[in-house]
Amino acid sequence: MASKPTESRIVTCESMTTGHPDKLCDQISDALLDAQLIRDPNVRCGIEAAASANEIWVFGQVASRNPLKYNEIVEIVRRVVRDIGYESAEEGIDPDTCTVRVTIDPQSADIAMGVVRDDGVLGASDQGIVYGYATNETPEGLPLPLVLAQRLTRALTKARTTGAIPWLRPDGKAQVSVRYVGDTPQEVTAFVVSAQHRAEVHIDEVRSTIEALAREALGNWVTSNTAVHINPTGRFVVGGPLADSGLTGRKVIADTYGGVAHHGGGAFSGKDGTKVDRSAAYAARQAALHLVRSKLAARAEITIAYAIGIDKPVAVSVDTFGTGTMPDEQIAELVALKLDLRPAAMIERLELRTPIFVRTARDGHVGHADLPWEHENTVDPKTEFLTRVAERAGASQGAPGRFPCGHLQRLGKEHLSVGEHFPYGAQGAELLACVVCESIEASATATKGGRA
């Protein structure tokens, strides 16, 4: 639902550093997935991790011709913990002495028969609902408070790993509240940062140093009225799994749209592309981005639903929150018919057989320009699409005011952005392509060289 132009509201989003216990588990799951993909690009994988104190559990299902061995899994787990920056059990977890327990089973034959069907089609590995969202309020296509919260956690991680703030430790979180008027962000009303630090550092130094870093990261969005909360409890020395247990998939809201859009509930990390709660969520994001970047909407949320063993979605819907330049139902038909949402097609288009996933577990699954699903991957409506329309013009026989396919009422060119003047037989005519199936209507009243 669109906000009223004068309505004031506050939207809050959060982000975690790489050393947060839940993010630690996400990175373990995706590091193992990446390692499996290097071994076997066709692996079917669902790996989760849990962490508490100085112990890590790895469990799940894998179907592969060349699965990782136990000692390889243990070494990858230790490497992830070490790369994040943990050094001892006293500060969170020790990469060299932590206990690693592994329980990996083959994928259920009942599930496998729906994924790899007898007819050779790759089916969805489960039923499920996924969502993709995009907005024009930031270059990343993400809500501003989420982008700002991510700036804070990335600034913390950079300051720690470069040694700029030597007493910072890996665990941390940030939260940013932004006031909107209508759909336009105005200012940061509050921000919260909780950063793990060494015991010998005084809280006053922690607060002043982190506040300066945060203000620089947030820039002009911070005002004199912004409420600031840095390590509100006064001490954050014990962190990581020693302070809080971690589990794969518990930060899917922060990793996607910050609560501004829906989430189907399925975790991403540790899952290969046959699992549509990951692959289709990425495809839905790609579709939403295209709608926004094509200026069909200022905001868009795509919903896709699947049935286990079936390759095509059972439902596709679109919500543009009142910002669409054409009805949402028509955009949904366009998405369903123009974008191949079968698992095999999504895996190929989004490059989901390549080892790119641990990066998403560290930095979030959307908003990074180098990720395949952040690319539009659709034809330019003014070039290739129109060429196909022109080529098919001679076969069209629609009555004025209707498309021959019967899908939709005729729309104005300002909505379709695909109307052009083409030669049509012996006459000139304006042709409008149905955005659903590309059938063509030739205006009966057009004259050569003129407009309908």
Task: Say what each PLM segment does.
Residues V43-I47, G172-V178, T226-I230, A297-A307:
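A short glycine-rich, hydrophobically flanked beta-strand micro-motif that places a catalytic Asp/Glu
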Residues V43-A112:
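Conserved beta-ketoacyl condensing-enzyme motif
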Residues R299, T303-A390, G449:
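Internal helix-turn-beta structural module
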Residues M16, H20-C25, G123-T138, V237-A261, ...:
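Conserved phosphate/anionic-ligand binding catalytic regions in large, soluble enzymes, centered on
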Residues A155, V201-V292:
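Glycine-rich anion/phosphate-binding loop at the beta-strand->alpha-helix junction
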Residues L408, E420, Y424, L431-E441:
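Periodic, rod-like helical contexts
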Residues A2-G46:
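N-terminal, positively charged regions that mediate nucleic acid binding
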Residues T12, R82-V237, G367:
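Glycine-rich, mobile lid/loop segments that gate access to catalytic sites or pores
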